[in-house]
């Protein structure tokens, strides 16, 4: 069956009113061939549409539809993309998927590198598998912003790091995007002694030359698990080397701020934690454009928590039951600080923070999002947890109550004997959770896009 075949029709939608039926295949909108979700969303935006459908017997029919500008037609297809996701053509020396243990669910080993997922879901792509036709389509459809894994603009070094002889050509694609005003948010996974130092200076300089099309740059330290046998030998950052990268990026950012009014580049929070330095203040991160890469995440969390706490009356907090928070090693001191602030306002607040050492991936992995259910159970069983356990929601797979190791929240609750509440990366929600106020269940927070993509991704 064609992936543009209609799987369901929203009964309250323009498509239903026009008489589109399940099983028909969408072929054209206003004369434009529909290949995937980008074509569908772009060409169905207008208020007046001429939709061509192919019926199961091979015959075609055309419908004229009137709707609100930007209103969705109301069609669901076999997959979210209306096509197969494009897999990565690289063999990056730092690829995290290559460092995962065996025996995990198959979908976790799929490496996507798809421009459509970059635009729709915020995924990062390397641009190495884009054909000239696809590059032109991004320009023609104004697909923007896109998130680009750059790593280095040195063409030879990029080919070496991505283990793809054509990887350097992607810099030319970026320059073409910049000339056509396609906005790009860029990521640099920094590997000690490889693409930092002078190579990082060149990368920042070259990307600044594409400003304002290059809208932001994040520099994040490479993650190294214990599963690297047979892989490229990588080292990790220590206090001194992490500090050197911070100085380098902050120096560039200060010069760019003076010249163009924006810092453009930021180190992730993890670099500051590795270097043992205080995180920059809220205003340093400007619009927080790189939160998904951990840039300014803890600063924003702290500021949101402060504001929420200011609005909270002590009597609202008085009924909070004793609790504990499980998180990654790196974030634990910051959460302890937030609990202390809550306790200063209301002396009855009783909470503990437990930093979970990552035995599943290796102790060098200290972020909360990679903590597994098995490690939670092993390290918290028999500990004083109070009456409830709070965990960051990013420990769980999107839309599920399941950790990366397939241990469920129900398993953890049963083994530890306390209810588990997943809290989003949001200071207001964290404050409510600490104070014992009800927060919105995960299932109700899911957007339609997350649901559709997750259902698709399960079938990869």
Can you annotate each of these PLM segments?
Residues 1-10:
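PDZ/PDZ-like groove recognition
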Residues 15, 23-26, 51, 95:
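Terminal peptide-recognition signature
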Residues 60, 67-213, 222-252:
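Conserved Radical SAM active-site core
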Residues 17-35:
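Conserved PDZ fold ligand-binding element
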Residues 5, 275-460:
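Radical SAM enzyme core and accessory elements
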Residues 14-19, 41-42:
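Short, surface-exposed secondary-structure edge patches
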Residues 158, 193-194, 214-240, 260-283, ...:
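Flexible glycine/acidic-rich beta-alpha junction loops that bind and position SAM and/or redox cofactors
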Residues 41-77:
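PDZ-domain C-terminal substructure recognizer with occasional recognition of PDZ-binding tails
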């Amino acid at each position: 069956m064609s992936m543009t075949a209609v799987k369901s029709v929203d009964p309250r939608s323009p498509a239903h009113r026009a008489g589109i039926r399940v099983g028909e295949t969408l072929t054209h909108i206003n004369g434009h061939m529909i290949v995937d979700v980008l074509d569908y969303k772009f060409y169905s935006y207008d208020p007046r549409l001429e939709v061509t459908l192919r019926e199961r017997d091979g015959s075609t029919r055309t419908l004229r539809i009137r709707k609100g500008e930007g209103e969705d037609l109301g069609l669901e297809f076999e997959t979210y993309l209306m096509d197969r996701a494009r897999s990565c053509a690289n063999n990056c020396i730092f690829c995290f998927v290559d460092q995962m243990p065996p025996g995990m669910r198959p979908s976790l080993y799929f490496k996507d590198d798809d421009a459509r997922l970059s635009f729709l879901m915020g995924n990062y792509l390397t641009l190495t598998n884009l054909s000239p036709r696809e590059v032109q389509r991004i320009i023609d459809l104004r697909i923007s912003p896109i998130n680009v894994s750059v790593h280095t603009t040195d063409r030879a070094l990029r080919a070496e790091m991505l283990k793809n002889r054509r990887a350097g050509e992607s810099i030319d694609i970026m320059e073409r995007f910049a000339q056509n005003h396609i906005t790009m948010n860029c990521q640099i996974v920094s590997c000690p002694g490889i693409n930092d130092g002078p190579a990082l200076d060149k990368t920042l300089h070259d990307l600044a030359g594409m400003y304002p099309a290059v809208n932001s740059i994040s520099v994040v330290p490479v993650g190294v698990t214990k599963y690297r046998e047979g892989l490229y030998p990588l080292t990790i950052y220590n206090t001194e080397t992490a500090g050197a990268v911070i100085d380098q990026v902050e120096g560039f950012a200060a010069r760019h701020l003076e010249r163009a009014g924006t810092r453009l580049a930021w180190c992730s929070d993890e670099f500051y934690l590795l270097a043992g330095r205080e995180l920059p203040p809220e205003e340093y991160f400007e619009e927080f454009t790189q939160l998904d890469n951990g840039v300014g995440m803890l600063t924003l969390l702290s500021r949101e928590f402060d504001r929420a706490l200011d609005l909270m009356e002590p009597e609202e907090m008085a009924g909070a039951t004793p609790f504990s928070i499980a998180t990654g090693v790196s974030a634990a001191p910051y959460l302890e600080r937030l609990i202390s602030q809550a306790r200063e306002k209301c002396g009855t607040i009783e909470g503990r923070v437990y930093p979970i050492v990552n035995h599943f991936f290796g102790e060098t992995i200290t972020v909360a999002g990679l903590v597994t259910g098995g490690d939670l159970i092993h390290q918290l069983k028999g500990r004083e947890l109070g009456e409830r356990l709070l965990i960051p929601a990013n420990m769980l797979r999107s839309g599920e109550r399941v950790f990366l190791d397939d241990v469920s929240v129900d398993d953890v609750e049963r083994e530890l004997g306390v209810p588990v509440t997943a809290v989003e990366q949001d200071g207001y929600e964290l404050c409510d959770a600490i104070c014992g106020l009800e927060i919105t269940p995960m299932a109700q927070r899911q957007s339609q896009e997350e649901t559709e993509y997750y259902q698709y991704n399960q079938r990869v």
